[in-house]
Amino acid sequence: MTSQRTRERLIQRLYEEGLSNARVLEVIRRTPRHLFVDEALAHRAYEDTALPIGHNQTISQPYMVGRMTELLLAAGPLDKVLEIGTGSGYQTAVLAQLVERVFSVERIQVLQDRAKERLAELSLRNVVFRWGDGWEGWNALGPYNGIIVTAAAAQVPQALLDQLAPGGRLVIPVGAGDVQQLLLIVREEHGFSRHVLDAVRFVPLLNGPLA
């Protein structure tokens, strides 16, 4: 169920689907995804598919975790990354093994509490958590070299653009329903460059009262 061979099959599939960053693939290989899903779904943890984690949220497909992480790191190592949507904590755990510090915002407190426990179990101690509205980012600790958003926004939140450091990279799904696109936004000297990448499907990025 969680054997090394099962994990190796997943890594081979991700490689065949186009992931190429050896460090990202190695981190996905060694990160125990079965710890981030309900015990009843642990037998599916190393399938390349999103899985429900409760509260109308999902743990992202491993390919998408790898894809977004590769995009974030494409220009080189990052020391300060903001994650919008802690969720299960799986993407957080992958990032924590690849960058110096992760600042993770989640609006559903029970999900974030579980994620904290999982990361502590894995001795990943370079993550700072905040229970809050992801649309607002985390201005007090910005700016950030990288920002990754794990839910689809109707449009790019201005607060996230404001909190992106010069040269910083924002990876975010944008759109509603079945019409969503993954964007890479880079803060340049005189503005932002936007690159439209893949068609994707994420749960919506909510705002308003916290849960």
From Swiss-Prot:
Would you identify the family this protein belongs to, as annotated? Belongs to the methyltransferase superfamily. L-isoaspartyl/D-aspartyl protein methyltransferase family.
Work out whether the entry's keyword set contains Methyltransferase: yes
- Principal location: cytoplasm
Stored InterPro entries: PCMT, SAM-dependent_MTases_sf
What's its EC?
A: 2.1.1.77
Briefly, what is this protein's role? Catalyzes the methyl esterification of L-isoaspartyl residues in peptides and proteins that result from spontaneous decomposition of normal L-aspartyl and L-asparaginyl residues. It plays a role in the repair and/or degradation of damaged proteins.
What is the designated name of this protein? Answer: Protein-L-isoaspartate O-methyltransferase
Q: Which GO terms fall under biological process for this protein?
A: methylation; protein modification process; protein repair
Cited SUPFAM superfamilies? S-adenosyl-L-methionine-dependent methyltransferases
Which leading EC class covers this enzyme?
A: transferase
Listed GO cellular component terms?
Answer: cytoplasm
Report whether Repeat shows up as a keyword of the record.
no
User: What NCBIfam families does this protein map onto?
Assistant: pimt (TIGR00080), PRK00312.1 (NF001453)
Enumerate the UniProt keywords alphabetically. Answer: Cytoplasm, Methyltransferase, S-adenosyl-L-methionine, Transferase
Annotated localization: Cytoplasm
List the Gene Ontology MF annotations in alphabetical order: protein-L-isoaspartate (D-aspartate) O-methyltransferase activity
Please list the residues that make up the active site.
Answer: S60
Name of a matching Pfam family: PCMT
